[in-house]
Amino acid sequence: WSYQISPMAGGTQSTATIYSNEDLGAEKVRLVFRRHTEWGQSVFLYGSEPGLSCAKNCRVSMTFDDNKPITLDGSIPPTGEPAIFIEEDKKFIAQVEKAKSVAIEVTVKGKPSSTLHFDVGGYDATRFQPLPQK
């Protein structure tokens, strides 16, 4: 995991990031936890062009450790970045805090689906800065 706090677009952003074990296309995919003072909290996968495929609103299937797969709401950003947002961010982060690994099914535009594996066991919630109270 890599943790960072930096100024960004009219606020401060705190991120926790880890790369997938596998390459997808030209590079590995990042799993990003982000808290921004203006935008709030979000969780997303960030890849490379041509980007990850998902309907405007979709369901993302994932498996934490050896548990049964679960499906969470997902979406693509309207700005066109090669990303998929996990809309149920609190639920996802709560699962990561208890897990050693997560396998997430994704589709790259124009290709069959694949599974990305992330070794999330070293996640340190104390290094992912909370948002200030409004």
Features from the language model and the residues they span:
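A generic "folded-domain core" signal
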Residues: W1-K134
